[in-house]
């Protein structure tokens, strides 16, 4: 086992003895990372970690670092919903790129605790279809589902940014890329990190 990956006891329901499972050192510090495309596996890992850390200590904030091109909508919504319902506040920090579902997870952080690094990029757009060669009936059903998902995502951006519905809808019509300061102006993040010239740290 690599140094810095501690184990914690975990007892499954119905089992008498606990088994020891690995917990990453960064997770013990309540630091979580979304550094890839959002899919079911990544979503389940992050959801499980947030729930576990919330049970472990409901008073300490969580910090979610995001550098993601986006991914699947439903797994992304699972992460977003979990962030809203766990007891600790979830700080979201954009480093690199938060695009598509990555930007929705970014905006889902605790209001006043959403931050972007100065050279980060953010992109929002409407959900895309996976049925490029579907039968007509399947395409219609897919289109109906896409409209529902678009409505859901739009409402989230409206609620979390404070921007009017028409403005968010207009932005989502295309791939809308933003700098860190533009994302702050749009209400997607609350703060942009600035470099401390004396220490070369970001504050």
UniProtKB/Swiss-Prot annotation:
Q: Which terms under GO biological process does the entry name?
A: protein quality control for misfolded or incompletely synthesized proteins
Q: Name one GO molecular function term.
A: ATPase binding
By its UniProt entry, which Pfam families does this protein fall under? CLP_protease
**Could you tell me which InterPro entries the record lists for this protein?**
ClpP, ClpP/crotonase-like_dom_sf, ClpP/TepA, ClpP_His_AS, ClpP_Ser_AS
CDD domains linked to this entry: S14_ClpP_2 (cd07017)
- Gene3D superfamilies for this protein: 2-enoyl-CoA Hydratase, Chain A, domain 1 (3.90.226.10)
Reactions listed under catalytic activity: Hydrolysis of proteins to small peptides in the presence of ATP and magnesium. alpha-casein is the usual test substrate. In the absence of ATP, only oligopeptides shorter than five residues are hydrolyzed (such as succinyl-Leu-Tyr-|-NHMec, and Leu-Tyr-Leu-|-Tyr-Trp, in which cleavage of the -Tyr-|-Leu- and -Tyr-|-Trp bonds also occurs)
Record field: transmembrane: none
Catalytic residues at 100, 125
User: Where does the record place it?
Assistant: Plastid, Chloroplast stroma
Q: Which domain of life is it from?
A: Eukaryota
Enzyme Commission number(s): 3.4.21.92
Q: Which UniProt keywords apply?
A: Chloroplast, Hydrolase, Plastid, Protease, Serine protease
This protein's GO CC annotations: chloroplast stroma; endopeptidase Clp complex
Protein family according to the UniProt entry: Belongs to the peptidase S14 family.
* Subunit record text: Component of the chloroplastic Clp protease core complex.
Q: What does this protein do?
A: Cleaves peptides in various proteins in a process that requires ATP hydrolysis. Has a chymotrypsin-like activity. Plays a major role in the degradation of misfolded proteins.
Know the name of this protein? Answer: ATP-dependent Clp protease proteolytic subunit
């Amino acid at each position: 086992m690599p140094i810095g990956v501690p184990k914690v006891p975990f007892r499954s329901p119905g089992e008498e003895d606990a088994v020891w499972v690995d917990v990453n050192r960064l997770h013990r510090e309540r630091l979580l990372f979304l550094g890839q495309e959002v899919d079911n596996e990544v979503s389940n890992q992050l959801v499980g970690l947030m729930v576990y850390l919330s049970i472990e200590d409901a008073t300490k904030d969580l910090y979610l670092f995001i550098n993601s091109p986006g991914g699947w909508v439903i797994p992304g919504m699972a992460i977003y919903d979990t962030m809203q319902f766990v007891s600790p506040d979830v700080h979201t920090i954009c480093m690199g790129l938060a695009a598509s579902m990555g930007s929705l997870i970014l905006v889902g952080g605790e209001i006043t605790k959403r931050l972007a690094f100065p050279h980060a990029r953010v992109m929002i757009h409407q959900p895309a279809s996976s049925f490029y060669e579907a039968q007509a009936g399947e395409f219609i059903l897919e289109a109906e589902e896409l409209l529902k998902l678009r409505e859901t995502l739009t409402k989230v951006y409206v609620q979390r940014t404070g921007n009017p519905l028409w403005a968010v809808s207009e932005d989502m019509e295309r791939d809308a890329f933003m700098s860190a300061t533009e994302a702050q102006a749009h209400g997607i993040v609350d703060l942009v990190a600035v470099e401390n010239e004396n220490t070369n740290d970001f504050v």
